[in-house]
A protein has these predicted regions:
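Short, well-ordered coil/turn segments that N-cap beta-strands
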Residues: 9-13, 45-47
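Phosphate/pyrophosphate-binding loops at sites that engage ATP/ADP/AMP, CoA/4′-phosphopantetheine
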Residues: 1-9
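Charged (often Lys/Glu-rich) extended helix/loop segments that serve as interaction or gating elements
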Residues: 36, 48-194
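Solvent-exposed, well-ordered amphipathic alpha-helical segments
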Residues: 3, 14-17, 142, 174
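Glycine-rich beta-strand-to-loop/alpha-helix junction loops that act as flexible
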Residues: 15-24, 53-56
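Metal-dependent catalytic neighborhoods of phosphoester/phosphodiester hydrolases
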Residues: 26-31
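Alpha-helix-loop-beta-strand connector modules within alpha/beta enzyme cores
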Residues: 3-4, 34-44
Length: 194
């Protein structure tokens, strides 16, 4: 930032250093961040420095559970059609792009069968990635697909494009199991349109 924009620092009062600071991640070097910020503030004491650590507070805290509705193979591409949408429910996957881990899968190696995940909207680009299932397992219609670490951005950037329903929001506790927090329906879509 200093190399490219340092000549502007005398003209501004604050500097936003952006988001994505995963301070709660086990491998994050907090001491290094503190050192960098202190050194920067010593050089530019008039600047108010802002960090956006948003996802640090939701790191690896939420899953999105989808169901396989259909399997399609076309031109050598294997796709699992899901009851969720990348465009509507996981826009960060398409925009950033962010590739979430899926429980029971891994990055496909040479020669492994690859599966693309397809969304349920009519948007032509509503699909993402390639995953291989552990142990060469063949996914089936009705299987649950568990996208890990999906609470950041997913909750705040969703859309109901063409009336695609949002997944329900649930909280899990080991002592009491799952508890429904919110179920979305047509009235939610209608309310957004008026």
């Amino acid at each position: 930032v200093e190399k490219r924009f340092g000549h502007f620092f005398s003209q501004v009062k604050w500097l936003n250093m952006g988001g994505g600071h995963l301070m709660t991640h086990k491998d994050y070097d907090e001491d290094e961040l503190i050192r960098i910020l202190r050194d920067f503030r010593a050089r530019y004491p008039h600047l108010r420095v802002i960090l956006e650590p948003g996802s640090a507070f939701t790191w690896d805290t939420g899953c999105l559970v989808a169901t396989v509705e259909d399997k399609v193979s076309n031109g050598g591409v294997n796709t699992l059609m899901l009851n969720v949408s990348f465009a509507c429910h996981m826009p960060d996957c398409l925009e950033m792009p962010y590739k979430p881990a899926i429980l029971g899968t891994h990055e496909p190696g040479e020669g492994e069968k690859r599966w693309r995940m397809g969304g349920n909207s009519c948007l032509a680009g509503d699909f993402y990635g390639d995953w291989a299932f552990d142990g060469g397992r063949e996914p089936q219609v009705g299987d649950r697909i568990v996208f890990r670490d999906m609470i950041h951005y997913t909750m705040v950037k969703t859309t109901m494009f063409n009336g695609v329903t949002h997944p329900s929001i649930m909280i899990y506790s080991p002592s009491s199991g799952f508890r429904l927090v919110r179920k979305f329906g047509y009235e939610d879509y209608k309310g957004r349109m008026s």
